[in-house]
Swiss-Prot record:
Belongs to the glycosyl hydrolase 22 family. It is an enzyme of class 3 (hydrolase). InterPro entries: Glyco_hydro_22, Glyco_hydro_22_lys, Lysozyme-like_dom_sf. Glycans are attached at residue 66. One of its GO terms (molecular function) is lysozyme activity. GO terms for biological process: defense response to bacterium; killing of cells of another organism. Disulfide bonds join 26-141, 47-131, 82-98, 94-112. Residues 21-142 form the C-type lysozyme domain. The keyword Hydrolase applies. The active site is at residues 52, 70. The keyword Kinase does not apply. Expressed only in the midgut where it is concentrated around the middle in all larval stages. This is Lysozyme 2.
């Protein structure tokens, strides 16, 4: 009986997903503001996070056509910006492991996302089309 119980417990632990921290629009805006992100960017960032990851820090995208994946709340691509767990080639412009985007703290993801923004602009995110004209208000968040 003990062996059966341990087997069932092990099976449950193996299939239970790690959910990470899931932010709300306002909790993300406040946290990013605390990390120094300009207030005039916060509505755009919350829109991108909503469409990229549903505000989930543990989000890992499905494989892209070039074999890369996107990681974390802002779905940062491992071919250009972070070192993938597989050890595959990456330009790793943010000088960070992709796994560092999958933690509860968004600070590493925010720093890298700000670099992506500086180098490529908002259009670096394919979901920007949902955030280009109508942005969610963050006025009620502060």
């Amino acid at each position: 009986m003990l062996k059966l119980t341990l087997t069932i417990l092990a099976a449950v632990l193996l299939v239970t997903p790690a959910f990470g921290k899931v932010y709300t629009r306002c909790s993300l805006a406040r946290e990013m503001h605390t990390l120094g992100v300009p207030k005039n960017q916060l509505a755009r960032w919350t829109c991108i996070a909503e469409h990229e990851s549903a505000y989930n820090t543990k989000a890992v995208g499905s494989m892209n056509s070039n074999g890369s994946r996107d990681y974390g709340i802002f779905q940062i691509n491992n071919y250009y910006w972070c070192s993938p767990p597989s050890g595959a080639f990456s330009y790793n412009e943010c000088k960070i492991k992709c796994a560092d985007f999958l933690v509860d703290s968004i600070e590493p993801a925010v720093k890298c996302a700000q670099l992506v923004l500086r180098q490529q602009g908002w259009s670096a995110w394919s979901t920007w089309k949902y955030c280009d004209h109508t942005l969610p208000s963050i006025d009620d968040c502060f």
